[in-house]
Curated annotation (Swiss-Prot):
GO terms under biological process: glycolytic process
Originating species: Leuconostoc mesenteroides subsp. mesenteroides (strain ATCC 8293 / DSM 20343 / BCRC 11652 / CCM 1803 / JCM 6124 / NCDO 523 / NBRC 100496 / NCIMB 8023 / NCTC 12954 / NRRL B-1118 / 37Y)
Keyword annotations from UniProtKB, A to Z: Cytoplasm, Glycolysis, Lyase, Magnesium, Metal-binding, Secreted
Stored PROSITE patterns: ENOLASE
Name of the molecule in the record: Enolase
Principal place of residence: cytoplasm
Family of this protein: Belongs to the enolase family.
Single GO term (MF): phosphopyruvate hydratase activity
Length: 441
């Protein structure tokens, strides 16, 4: 048993230059752990509360000194000298009870999560094992298939593209290291194509390119060209995923979806489902995130009934990593996958519970970054610890994104011959026939 002897928090900056929170946990046997918290650009309305100061004279109101004070005062008093650092569940539960709200609005999910991560890292450090081994044990061996966001739109950029993310997934690679190479080569091939056509190659929050396009289909055409230019076969070697972030397009009063940044077209829900189905039929799209507004549960069930056998339908804003929402979705047959963002729920314990529930229901779980990231690589260890099988952590540029990929390479090397990269088979929520169709598009 090794008690927590000190907890320290400070305000630092994320990848967008906005303040965020970092916490450190120290144990009586010298264990040390540090956790940094990301933040999102488009956030679900049901996410746990990210506590900000609201003082407009400082960081435009985005300061985190209140959350820092909560760690250094209330949380430290509750945990220091009272908890064994290896008792992650008890530590997380104590902070949840101390907060006393359903959405962590008192202490702030950012304050609680930073300590949750730091405690896990301190325990791993004290035991002398990698974080993924500490969190997952001896059965942690699956390296994830990456979702690489190479074209940004929507809230993640200033262009005229409605969909928030256009991603490539190296489903045919033999290892995660090779998958990262596939992605890097395709990313650079895409850059050359954009430059040749006179399009901008500046990047958005997540490291992807953010040029203007005529509509939401043009980026898909560029992805196909880039995959082929890099020497790979679309579908078989590299599939495509999109994040529609449809809550940004939805008008709850008229119950329509409007392509507000591109053509201005409006769709009823059945029309919008048909629009997405048409794109999935014509391109090797294997995954669609948030295709329906986060509050329209019946419509989620409808699109799942229509497309759920052949395309991964991911709930991000829809589920917000919350087991209550996930359980409701499972019972309704809504979605077939959940995006896992640790700061949406606020502790590692609750994150593990969401991943476990998803797997038991046959849903995939995709461990994800946020648009405002840090150099913290916890999600790389988390995805291997849980054998989740898929990770979404940005493009092949910006150190805050590359840090996660580099950590996966290190983990694969540590696991050596026991490591397994499942590629297309990480989509266990799709039928074998559906996977074959995507590979042959």
């Amino acid at each position: 048993m090794s008690l927590i002897t000190d907890i320290i928090a400070r305000e630092v900056l994320d990848s967008r230059g906005n303040p965020t929170l970092e916490a450190e946990v120290i144990t009586e046997l010298g264990g040390f752990g540090r956790g940094m918290v990301p933040s999102g650009a488009s956030t679900g309305e049901h996410e746990a509360v990210e506590l900000r100061d609201g003082d407009k004279s400082r960081f435009g109101g985005k300061g985190t000194t209140k959350a820092v004070a909560n760690v250094n005062d209330a949380i430290a008093k509750a945990l220091v000298g009272k908890f064994d650092v290896t008792d992650q569940r008890a530590i997380d539960q104590a902070m949840i009870e101390l907060d006393g709200t359903e959405n962590k609005g008192n202490l702030g999910a950012n304050a609680i999560l930073a300590v949750s991560i730091a405690a896990a890292r301190a325990a791993a450090d004290e035991l002398g094992v990698p974080l993924f081994s500490y969190l997952g044990g001896a059965n942690s061996y699956v390296l994830p298939t990456p979702m690489m966001n190479v074209i940004n739109g929507g809230a993640h950029s200033a262009n005229k593209v409605d969909f928030q993310e256009f991603m490539i997934m190296p489903v045919g690679a033999p290892t995660v290291k090779e998958a990262i190479r596939y992605g890097s080569e395709t990313f650079h091939a895409l850059k050359k194509l954009l430059e040749a056509d006179g399009k901008a190659t500046s990047v958005g929050d997540e490291g992807g390119f953010a040029p203007d396009f005529a509509d939401n289909e043009e980026p898909l055409k560029y992805l196909i060209r880039a995959i082929e230019a890099a020497g790979y076969k679309p579908g078989k070697d590299i599939a495509i995923a999109v994040d529609v972030a449809s809550s940004e397009l939805y008008d709850a009063e008229t119950k329509t979806y409007k392509l507000r940044w591109s053509t201005g077209e409006e769709f009823t829900t059945p029309e919008f489902i048909k629009y997405l189905e048409d794109l999935a039929d014509r391109y090797p799209i294997i995954s669609i995130e948030d295709p329906i507004d986060e509050n329209e549960w019946e419509d989620w069930a409808a699109i799942t009934a229509e497309l759920g056998k052949k395309v991964q339908l991911v709930g991000d804003d829809f589920f917000v990593t919350n087991t209550q929402y996930l359980e409701k979705g499972i019972n309704m047959g809504a979605a077939n996958s959940i995006l896992i963002k640790v700061n949406q729920i606020g502790t590692l314990t609750e994150t593990f519970e969401a991943i476990e529930m998803a797997k038991e229901a046959g849903y995939t779980a995709i461990v994800s970054h946020r648009s405002g990231e840090t150099e913290d690589t916890t999600i790389s260890d988390l995805v291997v610890a849980t054998n989740a099988g898929q990770i979404k952590t940005g493009s092949l540029s910006r150190t805050d994104r590359i840090a996660k990929y580099n950590q996966l390479i290190r983990i694969e090397e540590l696991l050596d011959t026991t490591a397994k990269y499942k590629g297309i088979h990480s989509f266990y929520n799709l039928s074998a026939a559906a996977r074959e169709v995507i590979e042959n598009k």
